[in-house]
Amino acid sequence: MTLDATLAADIDAVCRLTGQFTLRSGQQATEYFDKYLFEADPQLLLRVAREMVGLLPDGTDLLGGLELGGVPIATMVSSLTGRPALYVRKKAKEYGTCKLAEGPDVAGRRVTLIEDVITTGGAVRDATRALRAAGAEVDVVVCAIDRSPAGEHPLADVGLEVRPVLTKAELDAAREAGA
């Protein structure tokens, strides 16, 4: 639960769009949640990052921003905390350094993942496994919005704790309260 009383309503107002949209599944929808709109708004991004600071576990050495949406958030949280950030690609580069994670070496360090939205956790799961294989300790992901169904823990299979700033239920409640 966020300490910023209007954050859910403000994000919902900016990101929930109405119109005709084709979803990733190919289905048609009249409503769409465009998460990049809060990340592109410097004031909303700062408010989300401030909330995330309080959710970081003690002993975090590095902030791992997941491509693409976690990168601007991790950068802002890094700026607020002074902790270094690294940027975790979906796939390692095939040229240059051929790295999956750009930034400081992760071996022997505690990495807290930073993500914008978690629904099924696929990208977070892949990043967790890759970082652990590189020697990192990864136990927590802090996300702006947890859209997984209530009561489900999509990352329990990899032993990852999800610490959200907001949940889908909180966004829906903010919308209903303002309607």
From Swiss-Prot:
Chain positions recorded as 5-phospho-alpha-D-ribose 1-diphosphate binding sites: R24, R89, K90, K93, E115, D116, V117, I118, T119, T120, G121, G122, A123
Obligatory cofactor(s): Mg(2+)
Residues bound to orotate: T119, R147
Pathway(s) where this gene product acts: Pyrimidine metabolism; UMP biosynthesis via de novo pathway; UMP from orotate: step 1/2
TM regions (residue ranges): none
UniProt-listed InterPro entries: OPRT (IPR023031), Or_phspho_trans_dom (IPR004467), PRibTrfase_dom (IPR000836), PRTase-like (IPR029057)
GO biological process terms, semicolon-separated: 'de novo' UMP biosynthetic process; pyrimidine nucleobase biosynthetic process
Keywords on record: Glycosyltransferase, Magnesium, Pyrimidine biosynthesis, Transferase
Pfam families (UniProt xref): Pribosyltran
The keyword Transcription regulation appears for this protein: no
EC numbers for this chain: 2.4.2.10
GO molecular function terms attached to this record: magnesium ion binding; orotate phosphoribosyltransferase activity
Catalytic activity: orotidine 5'-phosphate + diphosphate = orotate + 5-phospho-alpha-D-ribose 1-diphosphate
Function: Catalyzes the transfer of a ribosyl phosphate group from 5-phosphoribose 1-diphosphate to orotate, leading to the formation of orotidine monophosphate (OMP).
Recorded family membership: Belongs to the purine/pyrimidine phosphoribosyltransferase family. PyrE subfamily.
Subunit structure comment from the entry: Homodimer.
Protein known as: Orotate phosphoribosyltransferase
Source species of the chain: Nocardioides sp. (strain ATCC BAA-499 / JS614)
